[in-house]
Amino acid sequence: MRLAVIGAMEEEVTILRNKLENAKTETIAHCEFTTGEYEGTEVILLKSGIGKVNAAISTTLLLDRYKPDYVINTGSAGGFHHTLNVGDVVISTDVRHHDVDVTAFDYEYGQVPGLPAAYAADEKLISITEEAVSELDGIQVAKGTIATGDSFMNDPKRVEEVRARFSDLYAVEMEAAAVAQVCHQFKTPFVVIRALSDIAGKESHVSFDQFLEQAAVHSTELVLKVIKRIH
């Protein structure tokens, strides 16, 4: 069984990389791939770079070259639900684009023509992640929609515009929908696990810098427990 884990930034992948046995790293088109083993499971760790284009390029390379059975997209996100706080973890039920608008041609908001409006996370991976959560103390975990766009959400007006578009929105970030779209096209099951480094619209740039490391620790802790359970 081969599992891929994708994070955008060094802070989001460094803990897991340091835990891989027999690790080997190669860089293709500025995308960093590290292969190794964790608790008997073959892992491909991808540092994708920030944003949807980087995520799409790197995920395509990942799925074509390494052919993983499952994909986990991890890292940080901005919280969108009123019950959430910095450090909490969100598990995706589905993932959507929040900066795609072809509604003039009768598509749903966020829908890329010819593709689904929402990319559903794999039920098995969601279930395994929920089981793994029970082993974590002091971390609140929620499950819902994660939305993606190529912008950092520190404009309160834009936050409200996006919130009004999606009824069950829990987090926003800059890569997950691109990862999910590529996984859909390759028919590869995925789930997104994101820890909150900020709450969207509330001095986001300040809290992001302060809490990115904490978010990376929380998301990685959960991913490691998922890997132990998945094989």
Swiss-Prot record:
Keywords in alphabetical order: Amino-acid biosynthesis, Hydrolase, Methionine biosynthesis
Gene Ontology biological process terms from the UniProt entry: L-methionine salvage from methylthioadenosine; L-methionine salvage from S-adenosylmethionine; nucleoside catabolic process
Pfam families: PNP_UDP_1 (PF01048)
MF terms in GO: adenosylhomocysteine nucleosidase activity; methylthioadenosine nucleosidase activity
Catalytic activity: S-adenosyl-L-homocysteine + H2O = S-(5-deoxy-D-ribos-5-yl)-L-homocysteine + adenine; S-methyl-5'-thioadenosine + H2O = 5-(methylsulfanyl)-D-ribose + adenine; 5'-deoxyadenosine + H2O = 5-deoxy-D-ribose + adenine
UniProt GO cellular component terms: cytosol
Pathway this chain belongs to: Amino-acid biosynthesis; L-methionine biosynthesis via salvage pathway; S-methyl-5-thio-alpha-D-ribose 1-phosphate from S-methyl-5'-thioadenosine (hydrolase route): step 1/2
Record-annotated active site: 12, 198
Gene3D superfamilies xref list: Nucleoside phosphorylase domain
Record bears the keyword Cell membrane: no
Domain of life of the organism encoding this protein: Bacteria
Family recorded in the similarity comment: Belongs to the PNP/UDP phosphorylase family. MtnN subfamily.
PANTHER family found in the cross-reference section: 5'-METHYLTHIOADENOSINE/S-ADENOSYLHOMOCYSTEINE NUCLEOSIDASE, 5'-METHYLTHIOADENOSINE_S-ADENOSYLHOMOCYSTEINE NUCLEOSIDASE
Protein name per Swiss-Prot or TrEMBL: 5'-methylthioadenosine/S-adenosylhomocysteine nucleosidase
Lineage of the species this protein comes from: Bacteria, Bacillati, Bacillota, Bacilli, Bacillales
Gene from which this protein is expressed: mtnN
